[in-house]
């Protein structure tokens, strides 16, 4: 059977390996997953209770207006319901943006190394990809590439903070850059980790209400998969002006998010104790990863996320990843990004200590 030609140029996205699979494959009793940037404390208690109370409604289709979650997000971000679209993860909203703006006759712009799904989704539309030479977000390079290909580029991705490297930019730098972009070019700010960046440095905080008030061509993406611990329920959102949101609704299938996910997301937003605990643990434990890197002369990029990336000169990241798997520790090998590096999710103190102990032995 023949398929569309663009599939010949696509690679499968490689998600983090599953705990049960690794336990069986390597014969280890205890497996620690530090690969997919999930919340190490699990699901928020308020969301768990909400799921218990609503489990008997799983047979019902969700309220397709999603009014409860939209109203909660609108209040949180000081925007209107009409400025919000809910997706099955922020990934789905990325798809909406790409299918709304890109085709085989235009292009998009992104950092040299960033979230892989941008390119995968865009290639489905036949769009051309321009990447900066810098692996991180160098806005001078972004500006030069945009100016050189302005007629082609109809969408720009800014992943802030960046996955899988962790760097971030000051909000003032971002807004200055957007001012130089034509109104017909959609600027997507993927803020999946922005709560972490804002906690670490207020200058990195991006406020969607201010962005969409100043710019008609900005889409702000948020997710419940990271800070809010709902990765398994697949729920995220986009915030933009009403014209953009209305266009996206033409691409959205009805009932695209489950009623349980919608309810749990509302409860998660209200669980301040859980999010505070997550953020405080993340950056106190992050410091231990920095100290470990310094001790072993491992290069890092200062991270504003819930993960840290280790870069190696002589050691091979694939070999290191395999040795960690044999010890029951799952991390993300970044060889598929063209990097000799590994990305490690910041876990609990117990998980991190086990990583340090085993990785110290491996590096000797």
Curated annotation (Swiss-Prot):
Cofactor dependence: pyridoxal 5'-phosphate
Coiled coil regions, renumbered to chain: none
Reaction catalysed by this enzyme: L-histidinol phosphate + 2-oxoglutarate = 3-(imidazol-4-yl)-2-oxopropyl phosphate + L-glutamate
Top-level taxon of origin: Bacteria
Intrachain S-S bonds: none
Entry-linked InterPro entries: Aminotransferase_I/II_large, HisP_aminotrans, HistidinolP_aminotransfase, PyrdxlP-dep_Trfase, PyrdxlP-dep_Trfase_major, PyrdxlP-dep_Trfase_small
Pathway stated in the Swiss-Prot or TrEMBL entry: Amino-acid biosynthesis; L-histidine biosynthesis; L-histidine from 5-phospho-alpha-D-ribose 1-diphosphate: step 7/9
EC number: 2.6.1.9
One Pfam family of this chain: Aminotran_1_2
Assembly notes: Homodimer.
Protein's recorded name: Histidinol-phosphate aminotransferase
Lineage: Bacteria, Pseudomonadati, Campylobacterota, Epsilonproteobacteria, Campylobacterales
């Amino acid at each position: 059977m023949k398929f569309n030609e663009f599939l010949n140029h696509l690679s499968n996205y490689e998600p983090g390996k599953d705990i049960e699979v690794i336990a069986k494959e390597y014969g280890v009793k205890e497996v620690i997953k530090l690969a997919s940037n999930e919340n190490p404390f699990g699901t928020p208690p308020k969301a768990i209770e909400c799921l218990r109370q609503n489990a008997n409604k799983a047979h019902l289709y969700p309220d397709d207006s999603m009014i409860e979650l939209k109203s909660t997000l609108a209040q949180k971000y000081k925007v209107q319901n009409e400025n919000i679209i809910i997706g099955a993860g922020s990934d789905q909203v990325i798809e909406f943006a790409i299918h709304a703006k890109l085709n085989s006759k235009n292009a998009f712009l992104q950092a040299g190394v960033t979230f892989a799904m941008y390119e995968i989704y865009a290639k489905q539309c036949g769009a051309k990809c321009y990447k900066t030479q810098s692996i991180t977000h160098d806005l001078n390079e972004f500006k030069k590439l945009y100016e050189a290909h302005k007629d082609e580029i109809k969408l720009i991705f800014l992943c802030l903070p960046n996955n899988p490297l962790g760097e971030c930019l000051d909000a003032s730098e971002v807004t200055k850059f957007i001012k130089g972009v034509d109104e017909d070019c959609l600027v997507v700010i993927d803020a999946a980790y922005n709560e972490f960046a804002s906690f670490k440095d207020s200058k990195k905080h991006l406020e969607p209400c201010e962005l969409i008030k100043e710019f008609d061509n900005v889409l702000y993406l948020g997710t419940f998969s990271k800070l809010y611990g709902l990765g398994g329920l697949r729920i995220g959102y986009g915030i933009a002006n009403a014209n953009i949101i209305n266009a996206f609704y033409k691409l959205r299938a009805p009932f695209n998010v489950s009623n349980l996910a919608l309810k749990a997301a509302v409860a998660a937003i209200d669980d301040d104790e859980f999010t505070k605990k997550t953020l405080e643990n993340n950056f106190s434990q992050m410091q231990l990863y920095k100290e470990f890197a310094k001790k072993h002369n491992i290069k890092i990029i200062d991270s504003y996320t819930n993960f840290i990336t280790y870069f190696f000169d002589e050691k091979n990241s694939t070999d290191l990843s395999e040795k960690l798997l044999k010890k029951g520790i799952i991390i993300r090998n970044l060889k598929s990004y063209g990097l000799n590096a590994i990305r490690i999710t910041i876990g609990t103190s117990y998980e991190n200590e086990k990583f340090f102990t085993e990785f110290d032995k491996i590096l000797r």
